[in-house]
Amino acid sequence: FRRVENVGPKVSAELLQSGIIAISLSLTAMLFYIWVRFEWQFSIGSIIALFHDVIITLGIFSVLSLEINLSIIAAVLTIVGYSMNDTVVIYDRIRENLNKFTKLNISEIANISINETLSRTIITSATTLLALLSIFILGGEILKGFSFAMILGVIVGTYSSIFVASPFLKYLKVNSKTMCRSEEK
């Protein structure tokens, strides 16, 4: 591969625009995936959590006046996938528990589901963070931005899967009756 050391402002703007398009397309694909796999309420909750992850990660970079380059865009795209994976695990358990605990409301079901998946979520995030911290410390200057963005994203993504995506289902009035009706179609 050809290595480029310096990128002019015009090329840089084009690359940033391409990165924004890539993030938008990935968010749209995730929305469609969740809509098909679960229900529209779940897709809205997951997209809000993903926007949260992207905005917080890029916002921290902006507040710290750190450069946003292609490796950061790649990290953000990876964060979107990572966070979606966490959210899907919790949503899948919520869907199972909606059928299992038909008398409970969505807040109680979400709480049970999060508690059932919490150890998996924490262990996965912790091992990922250990790998990212070693890349950040030992990886050299070229990997610092990427690994820092990923560290932020894993922390924010884990938080949003638990505290943003799942509780949002309450505001969309998800319950076992609405889910059972949609599964009969």
Place the predicted regions along the sequence by residue.
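A structural signal for conserved, well-ordered secondary-structure elements
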Residues: F1-K185
